[in-house]
Swiss-Prot record:
CDD domains: fungal_TF_MHR, GAL4. Residues 108-142, 661-683 are annotated as: Disordered. One of its GO terms (molecular function) is DNA binding. This is Transcription factor hmgR. The keyword Ligase does not apply. Keywords: DNA-binding, Nucleus, Transcription, Transcription regulation. SMART domains: GAL4.
């Protein structure tokens, strides 16, 4: 006769287990006999034990069994991961980074606890607290492969320069101080315009011409120093000690840039001979927001990170090492903090650039507008100066609004001024100096305006966002924005309209706005899973996906894959290594959106395809590392950790789609040919059918009705493990400073 073990998931989840011998925590620590006494029936009387009664101590028992610790912890971690990952609205670029940071933080803590559980109990309690695994083999390795670093540090070839240009640079103070030679200075400028300026819309190619270097040095000192500073980080000079000189030159140039910015802010310049307060300085500040100095990752030389006027005890400081949380604090210092400093620095630089633009009359008309170009009248035509002014107007609009959207701040650009910039038309006669640039900026400005409208409509407040998700009004709003996105794409996203670098840039920006907009459907699915789930069940699958929400999720998945595939292409041609910071922010955000969408559920073929895209992105980031402290190397490490976990934890689940009667229910259009083609659902397990490059181009999305139960993969979801509640003041934890770092946690 077959004897079946009673299910642990039956009607008695809180069953009490009896042990032959029990000891309180105090007796176990001392390895002493725990005498509870016996009653008339021979059973133990219960706490307190004789020893605790005699010493007047609390007599506490641990109800958990030692062999069960790791398993229960893993189950809870999985539930915490799924719920927090899928419920969290990624409404700014910082939210995605915080997800990555907290997940790595959780892995370090979990690895530490697992190793602690594997040690003998005596070792754990010898010092009164569990032993941590600081420095163990479970720590995530952030080092860059030596071959990648060797490629990044490969010396460049010096430029061929005429004697006249060399004599011009010989008068430069940096050359006279011996930091580098005149020919090396020209090499830095040439390589910046060759490898980096083409990836950013800030500068024209006016200063790329050697004949104009004299004007760059004499009339745009801030811009000149900024170009040299940025280029010196990305390019290593040939000769003995090239790498060491690279660090020295870059650091000295950054120090000089800081001095110039200080003079700008505090007005430390003769008004009769202005060299700092000009349009070139505005362009320099924009470049610094695109490419950061290496010093961003290190504390200031004078006082370190401590700016307090009082001495604080080491244990009370934010990063004081208390043992158990050292891994979390290490991740905060290495990953989250540099990214936040990047946003903070860019925000202040752009604010200074906007203030200087107002001072110079960049947005004025008439005589006031001439103040910005008095210094350039000797060597620039009027049309060139007017074009440079209009470029600055548009660049400031896009850069400020994009960063404000990313970090969740109110834009520094006044509403009236924004409308004025958007309504101004560039003169037809100026197009000869940069028609493709003007087309690119027009498209980017329209897309920025559209993204800002999406944010204002969906996320004016957390309470309002939740109300829209629960009432189904978000569908009407998406029906309003989706045609606008399609119209923008049809008008602007054409390869023949842009240079290749500009097209790649606007391609990534478009698909990110597309992902950002359709992610509202993902959040609606999670809210219904929370509302409809049975709290008594151990696992609640988030399968109450309406067809219209399934369509939105497919848009998110496809948009993310489009971004990451483009990133892989940039890596193949060597452009990713020189890309601005905003590209790496888009990579991080897109990867998080993709993993969130996949966790809700996906077909095996789409899941395999998406995870392969993530793997290629990881390889692209690693193979194009700038140095061992660039954020791309850390992004790659974190992404690899979570992609491998998603592969293990996305399990096959039976489809139990709940047909809702609310107005949110809508049927997607599925051609009969597609339904018949997907009748054999076991085929994707063996082969990968060709997937269209852009599903939205096909005019339909695969229907949920055509997906067999064994072809649907999703992440286990436990709504009872929600890390926050709707009643918590109406604010998402992602906006609460330290509460930003709470998100998902996959077990090892």
């Amino acid at each position: 006769m077959e004897i079946r073990r009673p299910s642990r998931h039956g009607n008695h989840p809180d069953r009490t287990y009896q042990r032959t011998y029990k000891a309180c925590i105090s007796c176990r620590q001392r390895k002493a006999k725990c005498d509870l006494g016996t009653g008339p029936d021979g059973l133990p009387l219960g706490p307190p034990c004789a020893k605790c009664r005699r010493e007047q101590k609390p007599c506490l028992f641990d109800e958990k069994r030692a062999w069960e610790r790791v398993k229960k912890r893993g189950t809870q971690s999985t539930s915490n991961l799924a719920n927090s990952m899928m419920r969290t609205v990624v409404s700014s670029g910082n939210d995605a980074l915080n997800i990555l940071f907290e997940a790595a933080n959780a892995q370090s803590q979990e690895d530490s606890m697992i190793e602690s559980d594997s040690l003998p109990e005596t070792e754990q309690h010898r010092s009164g607290h569990p032993v941590t695994s600081e420095g163990s083999s479970n720590q995530i390795d952030l080092t860059v492969p030596p071959d990648v670093l060797e490629k990044a540090m490969r010396p460049v070839e010096l430029s061929h320069v005429s004697k006249d240009v060399l004599s011009t640079w010989e008068a430069c103070r940096f050359v006279r101080m011996g930091w580098f030679t005149a020919r090396e200075a020209v090499t830095f400028i040439d390589l910046f315009f060759k490898n980096m300026s083409i990836l950013s819309p800030v500068l024209t190619d006016f200063y790329a011409d050697h004949k104009n270097h004299r004007w760059l040095i004499a009339h745009d000192p801030v811009l000149c120093c900024t170009i040299l500073m940025i280029s010196s980080r990305y390019h290593v000079l040939p000769g003995v000690g090239g790498q060491s000189r690279n660090f020295f030159i870059h650091h000295r140039l950054w120090q000089h840039c800081q001095q110039l910015v200080t003079r700008l802010i505090f007005g430390q310049e003769l008004s009769s001979q202005p060299k700092i307060r000009n349009i070139g300085t505005i362009e320099a500040l924009l470049l610094m927001s695109d490419w950061h100095p290496r010093s961003l990752h290190f504390p200031p030389e004078s006082d370190g990170w401590d700016s307090d006027l009082v001495t604080i005890d080491l244990e009370s400081t934010e990063y004081g090492d208390d043992g158990s949380n050292s891994s979390a604090k290490r991740w905060a210092k290495d990953m989250s903090e540099p990214a936040k400093r990047s946003d903070q620095m860019s925000w202040m630089l752009l604010g200074s650039a906007l203030s200087l633009a107002h001072e110079l009359g960049i947005y004025e008309t008439g005589d006031k507008a001439r103040d910005a170009f008095v210094a350039y009248e000797r060597f620039m035509t009027k049309d060139q100066m007017r074009l440079r002014r209009q470029r600055a107007q548009r660049l400031l609009y896009v850069y400020i609004n994009q960063l404000a959207w990313r970090i969740g701040c109110v834009s520094l650009m006044p509403q009236g001024l924004s409308h004025s910039i958007l309504n101004r038309q560039t003169s037809r006669e100026l197009s000869q100096y940069g028609e493709e640039w003007l087309t690119f900026m027009d498209s980017w400005m329209d897309l920025t305006k559209l993204a800002k409208s999406v944010t204002d409509m969906f996320f004016p407040s957390v309470t309002f966002a939740r109300q829209q998700l629960q009432s189904g009004r978000y569908i009407d709003l998406l029906d309003h924005f989706r045609p606008l996105l399609d119209k923008w794409k049809e008008r602007y996203l054409q390869p023949q309209l842009h240079d290749k670098p500009f097209y790649d840039d606007i391609f990534i920006e478009y698909h990110f706005v597309r992902v950002y907009t359709h992610s509202v459907g993902m959040q609606a699915v999670v809210e219904r899973a929370i509302a409809d789930g049975n709290a008594d069940e151990e696992e609640v699958r988030p399968m109450n996906i309406d067809p219209i929400d399934y369509e939105y999720i497919q848009e998110v998945i496809d948009g993310c894959c489009q971004i990451l595939e483009k990133v892989t292409q940039l890596a193949d041609i060597g452009a990713l290594r020189f890309s601005p910071v905003r590209i790496f922010v888009r990579i991080t955000s897109a990867s998080i959106f993709l993993m969130k969408a996949l966790s809700l559920g996906a077909r095996q073929a789409k899941l395999r395809e998406s995870l392969d895209v993530l793997e290629r992105t990881i390889q692209a980031l690693r193979s194009n590392a700038l140095d061992d402290i660039h954020l791309s190397t850390r992004y790659a490490t974190l992404l690899e950790t979570h992609v491998s976990r998603l592969r293990r934890h996305l399990v096959a689940s039976c489809k139990s789609l709940k047909r809702r009667r609310e107005s949110t229910t809508r049927h997607s259009m599925v051609p009969p040919s597609y339904a018949s083609a997907t009748s054999d659902e076991h085929a994707p397990l063996i082969t990968n059918p060709p997937v269209p490059q852009n599903m939205s181009d096909m005019g339909f999305t695969p229907s949920l009705n055509d997906i067999a139960a064994d072809d649907w993969l999703s992440l286990p979801f436990d709504p009872s493990m929600a890390p926050f509640s709707i009643s918590s003041g109406g604010q998402f934890p992602a906006y609460e400073g330290g509460g930003l770092n709470f998100l998902w946690n996959l077990p090892s």
